[in-house]
Amino acid sequence: MNIKEEAIETEGIVKESLPNTMFRVELKNKHIVLAHLSGKMRKHFIKIVPGDKVKVELSPYDLTKGRIVYREK
């Protein structure tokens, strides 16, 4: 099985911007996770600011960390 297939994808709202493209994201179920920006978003200079609605991929092994893969318009 591919790691990408195992990832849990959910939506959330960015609450805080941290150094090194890290963000605190509040998920729909009110959990707070620490998320970093995906490589493609860094490459294309997609900016994320607090208040943005984003899609986050979580690993089933550590549900406190994730990767931001999409920013809603």
Curated annotation (Swiss-Prot):
Localization recorded for this chain is: Cytoplasm
**Keywords for this protein:** Cytoplasm, Initiation factor, Protein biosynthesis, RNA-binding, rRNA-binding
The family database entries (InterPro entries) matched by this protein are listed as: NA-bd_OB-fold, RNA-binding_domain_S1_IF1, S1_domain, TIF_IF1
Primary place of residence? Answer: cytoplasm
Q: Which domain of life is it from?
A: Bacteria
The answer to whether the entry has keyword Cytoplasm is yes
SUPFAM superfamilies, sorted: Nucleic acid-binding proteins (SSF50249)
Q: Name one GO cellular component term.
A: cytosol
Disulfide connectivity for this sequence is none
Q: Give start and end of each S1-like domain.
A: 1-73
Q: Name one GO molecular function term.
A: ribosome binding
Please verify whether the record's keywords include Iron: no
Q: What does this protein do?
A: One of the essential components for the initiation of protein synthesis. Stabilizes the binding of IF-2 and IF-3 on the 30S subunit to which N-formylmethionyl-tRNA(fMet) subsequently binds. Helps modulate mRNA selection, yielding the 30S pre-initiation complex (PIC). Upon addition of the 50S ribosomal subunit IF-1, IF-2 and IF-3 are released leaving the mature 70S translation initiation complex.
Q: Which family does it belong to?
A: Belongs to the IF-1 family.
Assembly and interaction partners = Component of the 30S ribosomal translation pre-initiation complex which assembles on the 30S ribosome in the order IF-2 and IF-3, IF-1 and N-formylmethionyl-tRNA(fMet); mRNA recruitment can occur at any time during PIC assembly.
State the PANTHER family in the record: TRANSLATION INITIATION FACTOR IF-1, CHLOROPLASTIC (PTHR33370:SF1)
Name by which UniProt lists this protein? Translation initiation factor IF-1
